[in-house]
Amino acid sequence: MLFRSTPSHGYLDAVDRHPWLGVCFDTCHAWAAGHDLASPGGMTATLDALVATCGPGRLALVHANDSKDPLGSTRDRHDNIGTGRIGAAAFGELFAHPALAGVPVVVETPSEGATGHAKDIATLRDLAATPVATG
């Protein structure tokens, strides 16, 4: 079973009391809740905090999406990767984080007509393949 927090609800610390729960990290939810993923090192710090709070190996799924709204807005309005307020560089940090090893990523962005999510998937693949200096 996966647990996904929503903006403005800080209950991920409960996961450590339930060993059968995993965590779904939603980038737009984290942004909406006030985690500054866009600043250099921001995604890394947020994922470090998630691992420290929930425990290693608990991250089981990522919902990847940029945000149309300002940091801390508590609004969950998805944007295409690299075109919103989070920005492409944060997703490069996401893929460089060791907690992401083997974790599936689901694209949750606005569909772009007949091509669907192809552009966002290609962008994420490029970012995942590009080395990022961390920490």
Predicted regions located by residue number:
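Acidic/histidine-rich catalytic cores of soluble enzymes
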Residues: F3-I81
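A structural signal for well-ordered alpha-helical scaffolds and beta->alpha junctions
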Residues: S5, M43, G87-A88, H117
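Secondary-structure boundary/capping positions in well-ordered alpha/beta enzyme cores
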Residues: H18-P19, G57, A101-V103, P131
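A short, acidic, amphipathic alpha-helical segment used as a generic capping/interface helix at domain edges
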Residues: T44-T53, R85-A99
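Active-site loop/helix belt of alpha/beta enzymes
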Residues: G84-I86, I121-A122
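S-adenosyl-L-methionine
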Residues: F95-P104, R125-T130
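A short, acidic, flexible beta-alpha connecting loop/helix-capping segment that sits on the rim
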Residues: V106-T115
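C-terminal helical cap(s) of enzyme catalytic domains, especially alpha/beta-barrels
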Residues: A114-A133
